[in-house]
């Protein structure tokens, strides 16, 4: 009686072995892949071992967290045929072997999990198929496609009396995964303090909790500092130039007063202005990163470098933003040089203005490359502008229907960015217009003589007739 249970167990094991032999064995595995770069060729290999007859091999792409499986390739052993299910891909994959799929030019959209399903016939009956599968994650990388360095809050004015914070923004787009972004100054890496949130531009100079550090030898030496101070003294001994936005006086500057004339008077460029405060310590830099995922799987990275600007030191300093990424063989780089504006070039049209013309005075360049973008302010020396305003902000000043009274008037263009300010003066020469008799135009350039009176009477009579 005791042998009966053991006999039954032996019979069950023997039956299971017989069933396994009838069904056959099948093992499937997919060779792992390192991350690949978009545009490269990729081969997905599905290795399997079996002693049965193959029925089919099916490749799936898994999406939506595994809830959707999209057939991308099928090998049908019954008919010895293979075909693609990837209509949108226009058969970008080729069957190299029965278990291998090749993507000649992989895309970022190909990133994700894949599964290989293999089916064999059951030895006991051809109506039954035994299945096994393996899976792999295809990690597709993409190098950044663009890099740009801009100044935050640009254009911004020049600060003459107090220090102000300045921020450079490096924008890197098109990378997957997110690249590493860092800054250099004059070719040397910047040791920046990581920051989660940047201070406001008006919150005053940014401070560092680390111990005090002396001046950077690469940025400031005695010669450069002495040159800056001597230039500052020289310019202010010669008189204070026009600044950021001082309290403006409508009294004409005697040094700029010139009697009206019809001669061509060139523009007068006033020397640049420097601030009256000087830093004596190395600037402290603060760095913050932000990441914005894109709809295509890439990431836009913005690196913001903030410090307290010192025009004496930072003017003509070279800042570079560099990017490291596993899909790049060498770092990407973008450079900017901080430069204060110097000598705006003024163009006036028409070159020979007559009474009643519309005159345009335009800044069309500088004597140097300027960064960041400057802001422009126009004023009339000793008086208000033609429209009655005290100043006009913009690159182009438009004077409509200029009257004869503007002949000889002087206009000042102030170009400024956080690194400095410069003034340019130009004189407007207005010639007589033979089509407009003398004395028939008021200060707004409109007709006020007999012809104008007759025109007014005609218009009034027309209105009366229409009303009746």
From Swiss-Prot:
<keyword id="KW-0628">Postsynaptic cell membrane</keyword>
<comment type="function">
    <text>Involved in synaptic inhibition in the brain. Selectively regulates inhibitory presynaptic differentiation through interacting with presynaptic NRXN2.</text>
</comment>
<keyword id="KW-0770">Synapse</keyword>
<keyword id="KW-0449">Lipoprotein</keyword>
<keyword id="KW-0325">Glycoprotein</keyword>
<keyword id="KW-1015">Disulfide bond</keyword>
<dbReference type="Pfam" id="PF07686">
    <property type="entry name" value="V-set"/>
</dbReference>
<keyword id="KW-0336">GPI-anchor</keyword>
<dbReference type="InterPro" id="IPR036179">
    <property type="entry name" value="Ig-like_dom_sf"/>
</dbReference>
<dbReference type="GO" id="GO:0060077">
    <property type="term" value="C:inhibitory synapse"/>
</dbReference>
<dbReference type="GO" id="GO:0060074">
    <property type="term" value="P:synapse maturation"/>
</dbReference>
<keyword id="KW-0732">Signal</keyword>
<keyword id="KW-0393">Immunoglobulin domain</keyword>
<dbReference type="GO" id="GO:0098839">
    <property type="term" value="C:postsynaptic density membrane"/>
</dbReference>
<feature type="signal peptide">
    <location>
        <begin position="1"/>
        <end position="24"/>
    </location>
</feature>
<feature type="domain" description="Ig-like 1">
    <location>
        <begin position="25"/>
        <end position="132"/>
    </location>
</feature>
<feature type="disulfide bond">
    <location>
        <begin position="46"/>
        <end position="116"/>
    </location>
</feature>
<dbReference type="GO" id="GO:0042734">
    <property type="term" value="C:presynaptic membrane"/>
</dbReference>
<dbReference type="InterPro" id="IPR013106">
    <property type="entry name" value="Ig_V-set"/>
</dbReference>
<protein>
    <recommendedName>
        <fullName>Immunoglobulin superfamily member 21</fullName>
    </recommendedName>
</protein>
<dbReference type="InterPro" id="IPR007110">
    <property type="entry name" value="Ig-like_dom"/>
</dbReference>
<dbReference type="InterPro" id="IPR013783">
    <property type="entry name" value="Ig-like_fold"/>
</dbReference>
<feature type="glycosylation site" description="N-linked (GlcNAc...) asparagine">
    <location>
        <position position="407"/>
    </location>
</feature>
<dbReference type="GO" id="GO:0099550">
    <property type="term" value="P:trans-synaptic signaling, modulating synaptic transmission"/>
</dbReference>
<keyword id="KW-0472">Membrane</keyword>
<feature type="glycosylation site" description="N-linked (GlcNAc...) asparagine">
    <location>
        <position position="165"/>
    </location>
</feature>
<dbReference type="GO" id="GO:0009897">
    <property type="term" value="C:external side of plasma membrane"/>
</dbReference>
<comment type="subunit">
    <text>Interacts (Ig-like 1 domain) with NRXN2 (via Laminin G-like 1 domain) in a trans-interaction manner.</text>
</comment>
<feature type="domain" description="Ig-like 2">
    <location>
        <begin position="344"/>
        <end position="429"/>
    </location>
</feature>
<keyword id="KW-1003">Cell membrane</keyword>
<keyword id="KW-0677">Repeat</keyword>
<feature type="glycosylation site" description="N-linked (GlcNAc...) asparagine">
    <location>
        <position position="82"/>
    </location>
</feature>
<dbReference type="InterPro" id="IPR051427">
    <property type="entry name" value="Nectin/Nectin-like"/>
</dbReference>
<dbReference type="InterPro" id="IPR003599">
    <property type="entry name" value="Ig_sub"/>
</dbReference>
